[in-house]
Amino acid sequence: MAIVKMKPTSAGRRGMVRVVTEGLHKGAPYAPLLEKKNSTAGRNSNGHITTRHKGGGHKHHYRVVDFKRNKDGIPAKVERIEYDPNRTAFIALLCYADGERRYIIAPRGIQAGAVLVSGAEAAIKVGNTLPIRNIPVGTTIHCIEMKPGKGAQIARSAGASAVLLAKEAAYAQVRLRSGEVRKINVNCRATIGEVGNEEQSLKKIGKAGANRWRGIRPTVRGVVMNPVDHPHGGGEGRTGEAREPVSPWGTPAKGYRTRNNKRTDNMIVRRRYSNKG
Protein backbone atom coordinates (compact mmCIF):
# COMPACT_ATOMS: atom_id res chain seq x y z
CA MET A 1 0.00 0.00 0.00
CA ALA A 2 1.00 3.63 -0.44
CA ILE A 3 -0.10 6.93 1.05
CA VAL A 4 -1.42 9.98 -0.76
CA LYS A 5 -1.66 13.59 0.42
CA MET A 6 -5.00 15.08 -0.52
CA LYS A 7 -5.31 18.36 -2.42
CA PRO A 8 -6.50 21.28 -0.24
CA THR A 9 -9.89 21.63 -1.93
CA SER A 10 -11.49 22.42 1.46
CA ALA A 11 -10.44 23.06 5.04
CA GLY A 12 -11.17 19.44 5.92
CA ARG A 13 -9.07 18.07 3.05
CA ARG A 14 -6.07 20.30 3.68
CA GLY A 15 -3.37 18.27 5.36
CA MET A 16 -5.29 15.00 5.04
CA VAL A 17 -3.12 11.95 4.35
CA ARG A 18 -4.80 8.63 3.60
CA VAL A 19 -3.74 5.10 2.72
CA VAL A 20 -4.33 4.04 -0.88
CA THR A 21 -6.69 1.06 -0.90
CA GLU A 22 -6.60 0.06 -4.58
CA GLY A 23 -5.92 -3.61 -3.87
CA LEU A 24 -8.79 -4.04 -1.42
CA HIS A 25 -12.09 -5.75 -2.11
CA LYS A 26 -14.74 -3.18 -3.11
CA GLY A 27 -17.84 -5.26 -2.45
CA ALA A 28 -19.65 -6.44 0.66
CA PRO A 29 -17.90 -8.62 3.26
CA TYR A 30 -18.49 -12.36 3.50
CA ALA A 31 -21.88 -12.51 5.25
CA PRO A 32 -21.55 -15.84 7.17
CA LEU A 33 -18.56 -14.39 9.05
CA LEU A 34 -20.38 -11.24 10.21
CA GLU A 35 -21.81 -10.69 13.67
CA LYS A 36 -23.85 -7.93 15.23
CA LYS A 37 -21.80 -5.35 17.09
CA ASN A 38 -23.59 -3.27 19.71
CA SER A 39 -22.28 0.18 20.56
CA THR A 40 -22.13 0.93 24.28
CA ALA A 41 -20.92 4.53 23.84
CA GLY A 42 -18.57 3.96 26.78
CA ARG A 43 -21.42 3.29 29.23
CA ASN A 44 -22.07 0.29 31.47
CA SER A 45 -25.42 -1.35 32.21
CA ASN A 46 -26.25 1.43 34.68
CA GLY A 47 -25.66 4.14 32.09
CA HIS A 48 -22.54 5.40 33.86
CA ILE A 49 -19.53 6.46 31.77
CA THR A 50 -16.79 3.85 32.15
CA THR A 51 -14.69 4.98 29.17
CA ARG A 52 -14.58 8.65 28.30
CA HIS A 53 -14.58 10.12 24.79
CA LYS A 54 -16.73 7.43 23.20
CA GLY A 55 -20.10 7.75 21.50
CA GLY A 56 -21.77 8.08 18.12
CA GLY A 57 -19.97 6.90 15.03
CA HIS A 58 -20.96 4.71 12.13
CA LYS A 59 -22.53 1.32 12.70
CA HIS A 60 -20.31 -1.70 12.07
CA HIS A 61 -20.62 -5.43 11.74
CA TYR A 62 -17.96 -7.43 13.52
CA ARG A 63 -15.84 -9.62 11.23
CA VAL A 64 -15.13 -12.97 12.90
CA VAL A 65 -11.36 -13.36 12.55
CA ASP A 66 -9.63 -16.72 13.01
CA PHE A 67 -6.87 -16.06 15.55
CA LYS A 68 -6.30 -19.76 16.32
CA ARG A 69 -5.36 -20.94 12.80
CA ASN A 70 -5.96 -24.53 13.92
CA LYS A 71 -7.09 -26.01 10.59
CA ASP A 72 -3.85 -27.91 10.12
CA GLY A 73 -2.51 -29.39 6.91
CA ILE A 74 -5.30 -28.06 4.68
CA PRO A 75 -4.12 -25.48 2.12
CA ALA A 76 -6.10 -22.26 1.95
CA LYS A 77 -6.20 -19.84 -0.96
CA VAL A 78 -6.42 -16.10 -0.32
CA GLU A 79 -9.59 -14.99 -2.09
CA ARG A 80 -9.29 -11.27 -1.35
CA ILE A 81 -7.99 -8.62 1.02
CA GLU A 82 -10.62 -6.51 2.81
CA TYR A 83 -10.89 -3.40 4.94
CA ASP A 84 -11.99 -4.04 8.52
CA PRO A 85 -13.53 -1.07 10.39
CA ASN A 86 -12.90 -2.78 13.73
CA ARG A 87 -9.09 -2.78 13.56
CA THR A 88 -6.14 -0.98 11.93
CA ALA A 89 -4.95 -4.08 10.04
CA PHE A 90 -6.56 -5.37 6.86
CA ILE A 91 -8.07 -8.87 6.83
CA ALA A 92 -7.73 -11.65 4.26
CA LEU A 93 -10.52 -14.06 3.33
CA LEU A 94 -9.20 -17.62 3.05
CA CYS A 95 -10.94 -20.42 1.19
CA TYR A 96 -9.76 -23.84 2.38
CA ALA A 97 -9.58 -26.88 0.13
CA ASP A 98 -12.65 -28.34 1.87
CA GLY A 99 -14.69 -25.21 1.05
CA GLU A 100 -14.66 -23.52 4.47
CA ARG A 101 -13.89 -19.82 4.56
CA ARG A 102 -12.22 -17.89 7.37
CA TYR A 103 -10.88 -14.38 7.90
CA ILE A 104 -7.31 -13.86 9.12
CA ILE A 105 -5.17 -10.80 9.79
CA ALA A 106 -3.57 -9.94 6.44
CA PRO A 107 0.25 -10.20 6.60
CA ARG A 108 2.43 -7.73 4.73
CA GLY A 109 3.00 -8.75 1.11
CA ILE A 110 0.08 -11.20 0.89
CA GLN A 111 -2.09 -10.87 -2.22
CA ALA A 112 -5.12 -12.63 -3.64
CA GLY A 113 -4.19 -16.04 -5.01
CA ALA A 114 -1.56 -16.88 -2.40
CA VAL A 115 -1.78 -20.32 -0.76
CA LEU A 116 -1.30 -20.54 3.01
CA VAL A 117 -1.01 -23.51 5.37
CA SER A 118 -1.00 -23.89 9.15
CA GLY A 119 0.41 -26.67 11.30
CA ALA A 120 3.72 -28.06 12.51
CA GLU A 121 4.73 -29.19 9.01
CA ALA A 122 4.02 -25.86 7.28
CA ALA A 123 6.83 -24.15 5.39
CA ILE A 124 8.55 -21.04 6.78
CA LYS A 125 6.65 -18.70 4.47
CA VAL A 126 4.88 -15.39 5.04
CA GLY A 127 1.33 -16.03 6.21
CA ASN A 128 1.85 -19.62 7.38
CA THR A 129 1.17 -20.41 11.05
CA LEU A 130 3.31 -22.84 13.06
CA PRO A 131 4.07 -23.72 16.67
CA ILE A 132 6.99 -21.60 17.86
CA ARG A 133 9.07 -24.75 18.43
CA ASN A 134 9.10 -25.23 14.62
CA ILE A 135 10.07 -21.64 13.75
CA PRO A 136 13.79 -20.81 13.29
CA VAL A 137 15.44 -18.31 15.63
CA GLY A 138 15.64 -14.83 14.09
CA THR A 139 12.34 -15.12 12.22
CA THR A 140 9.94 -12.15 12.18
CA ILE A 141 6.53 -13.23 13.45
CA HIS A 142 3.13 -11.78 14.35
CA CYS A 143 -0.24 -12.93 15.75
CA ILE A 144 1.43 -14.71 18.66
CA GLU A 145 -0.43 -16.80 21.20
CA MET A 146 0.24 -16.36 24.92
CA LYS A 147 -1.35 -19.69 25.86
CA PRO A 148 -1.42 -22.75 23.57
CA GLY A 149 -4.75 -22.96 21.78
CA LYS A 150 -6.13 -19.67 23.12
CA GLY A 151 -5.61 -17.71 19.91
CA ALA A 152 -3.30 -14.87 18.93
CA GLN A 153 -3.03 -11.98 21.39
CA ILE A 154 0.30 -10.29 20.61
CA ALA A 155 1.30 -8.26 17.50
CA ARG A 156 -2.07 -8.05 15.75
CA SER A 157 -2.34 -4.35 14.79
CA ALA A 158 -1.20 -2.72 11.54
CA GLY A 159 2.56 -2.95 11.00
CA ALA A 160 3.13 -4.96 14.19
CA SER A 161 5.70 -7.73 14.45
CA ALA A 162 8.07 -9.45 16.85
CA VAL A 163 11.37 -11.31 16.53
CA LEU A 164 12.06 -14.81 17.84
CA LEU A 165 15.33 -14.44 19.77
CA ALA A 166 15.94 -17.82 21.40
CA LYS A 167 14.41 -21.15 22.37
CA GLU A 168 15.21 -22.84 25.66
CA ALA A 169 13.40 -26.01 26.74
CA ALA A 170 9.70 -25.18 27.16
CA TYR A 171 9.94 -21.45 26.47
CA ALA A 172 11.07 -19.16 23.69
CA GLN A 173 12.16 -15.54 24.02
CA VAL A 174 10.41 -13.03 21.77
CA ARG A 175 11.33 -9.36 21.37
CA LEU A 176 8.32 -7.12 20.86
CA ARG A 177 8.23 -3.78 19.04
CA SER A 178 8.26 -1.97 22.40
CA GLY A 179 11.65 -3.50 23.21
CA GLU A 180 10.20 -5.88 25.78
CA VAL A 181 11.58 -9.42 25.72
CA ARG A 182 9.01 -11.95 26.85
CA LYS A 183 8.91 -15.72 27.39
CA ILE A 184 6.35 -17.61 25.30
CA ASN A 185 5.53 -21.32 25.51
CA VAL A 186 7.04 -23.10 22.49
CA ASN A 187 3.71 -24.84 21.84
CA CYS A 188 2.04 -21.48 21.20
CA ARG A 189 1.46 -20.63 17.57
CA ALA A 190 2.68 -17.63 15.60
CA THR A 191 2.36 -16.48 12.00
CA ILE A 192 5.39 -15.79 9.82
CA GLY A 193 5.97 -12.19 8.69
CA GLU A 194 4.56 -8.91 9.94
CA VAL A 195 1.09 -7.43 9.83
CA GLY A 196 0.24 -5.45 6.70
CA ASN A 197 -1.01 -1.86 6.32
CA GLU A 198 2.22 -0.68 7.93
CA GLU A 199 1.64 2.89 6.70
CA GLN A 200 -1.45 3.24 8.90
CA SER A 201 0.58 5.30 11.40
CA LEU A 202 1.23 7.96 8.72
CA LYS A 203 -2.47 8.63 8.21
CA LYS A 204 -3.87 12.09 9.06
CA ILE A 205 -7.63 12.31 9.41
CA GLY A 206 -7.82 15.98 8.34
CA LYS A 207 -10.83 17.07 10.39
CA ALA A 208 -12.58 16.51 13.70
CA GLY A 209 -15.63 15.03 11.98
CA ALA A 210 -13.58 12.04 10.83
CA ASN A 211 -13.00 11.14 14.47
CA ARG A 212 -16.73 11.44 15.15
CA TRP A 213 -17.37 8.93 12.35
CA ARG A 214 -15.10 6.56 14.27
CA GLY A 215 -17.07 7.00 17.50
CA ILE A 216 -14.45 9.21 19.18
CA ARG A 217 -15.79 12.24 21.06
CA PRO A 218 -13.80 15.39 21.95
CA THR A 219 -11.25 15.42 24.76
CA VAL A 220 -11.51 18.38 27.15
CA ARG A 221 -8.38 19.52 29.01
CA GLY A 222 -8.55 19.27 32.77
CA VAL A 223 -7.11 22.77 33.22
CA VAL A 224 -10.26 24.34 31.74
CA MET A 225 -12.63 22.36 33.98
CA ASN A 226 -14.01 23.22 37.40
CA PRO A 227 -12.29 21.89 40.55
CA VAL A 228 -15.13 19.43 41.10
CA ASP A 229 -14.44 17.83 37.71
CA HIS A 230 -10.64 17.57 37.60
CA PRO A 231 -7.60 18.06 39.89
CA HIS A 232 -6.27 20.65 37.41
CA GLY A 233 -9.51 22.65 37.36
CA GLY A 234 -10.39 25.99 38.92
CA GLY A 235 -8.56 29.28 39.34
CA GLU A 236 -9.22 32.77 38.04
CA GLY A 237 -8.19 33.10 34.41
CA ARG A 238 -5.46 30.95 32.95
CA THR A 239 -3.65 29.42 35.89
CA GLY A 240 -1.88 26.42 34.37
CA GLU A 241 -1.39 23.16 36.20
CA ALA A 242 -0.75 23.64 39.91
CA ARG A 243 0.62 20.10 40.27
CA GLU A 244 2.17 17.30 38.23
CA PRO A 245 -0.06 16.14 35.34
CA VAL A 246 -2.64 13.67 36.62
CA SER A 247 -5.77 11.92 35.41
CA PRO A 248 -9.25 13.01 36.60
CA TRP A 249 -8.83 10.43 39.40
CA GLY A 250 -5.44 11.69 40.55
CA THR A 251 -3.20 9.06 38.95
CA PRO A 252 0.03 10.55 37.50
CA ALA A 253 -0.36 10.86 33.74
CA LYS A 254 3.26 11.03 32.54
CA GLY A 255 5.22 7.79 32.64
CA TYR A 256 3.68 6.37 35.80
CA ARG A 257 3.91 2.57 35.80
CA THR A 258 0.56 0.91 36.40
CA ARG A 259 1.37 -2.74 35.70
CA ASN A 260 0.35 -4.88 38.68
CA ASN A 261 0.36 -8.53 37.67
CA LYS A 262 2.92 -10.35 39.79
CA ARG A 263 1.64 -13.70 38.57
CA THR A 264 3.26 -13.20 35.14
CA ASP A 265 6.26 -11.07 36.12
CA ASN A 266 8.56 -14.05 35.64
CA MET A 267 7.56 -14.23 31.96
CA ILE A 268 9.11 -10.82 31.23
CA VAL A 269 12.86 -11.11 30.63
CA ARG A 270 13.46 -7.45 29.78
CA ARG A 271 11.08 -4.58 30.48
CA ARG A 272 10.09 -2.23 27.69
CA TYR A 273 11.13 0.76 29.79
CA SER A 274 14.49 -0.60 30.97
CA ASN A 275 16.40 2.15 29.10
CA LYS A 276 14.19 5.01 30.28
CA GLY A 277 15.75 5.50 33.70
Swiss-Prot record:
Q: Which GO terms describe its cellular component?
A: large ribosomal subunit
The leader peptide range reads: none
Molecular function per GO: rRNA binding; structural constituent of ribosome; transferase activity
Q: Which domain of life is it from?
A: Bacteria
Any Gene Ontology biological process: cytoplasmic translation
- Compositional bias (Polar residues): 39-49
Bias kind Basic and acidic residues: ranges: 229-244
> Where is the sequence biased in composition, kind Basic residues?
50-60
Q: Please indicate if the UniProt record lists Cell cycle as a keyword.
A: no
Asked whether the keyword rRNA-binding is assigned, the reply is yes
Region Disordered, as annotated, extends over 37-60, 223-265
What keywords tag this UniProt record? Ribonucleoprotein, Ribosomal protein, RNA-binding, rRNA-binding
> Which regions span the lipid bilayer?
none
The subunit structure is:
Part of the 50S ribosomal subunit. Forms a bridge to the 30S subunit in the 70S ribosome.
Provide the family line.
Belongs to the universal ribosomal protein uL2 family.
Q: What does the protein in this record do?
A: One of the primary rRNA binding proteins. Required for association of the 30S and 50S subunits to form the 70S ribosome, for tRNA binding and peptide bond formation. It has been suggested to have peptidyltransferase activity; this is somewhat controversial. Makes several contacts with the 16S rRNA in the 70S ribosome.
Q: What is the official name of this protein in its record? A: Large ribosomal subunit protein uL2
* Classification of source organism: Bacteria, Pseudomonadati, Pseudomonadota, Betaproteobacteria, Neisseriales
Q: Which gene encodes it?
A: rplB
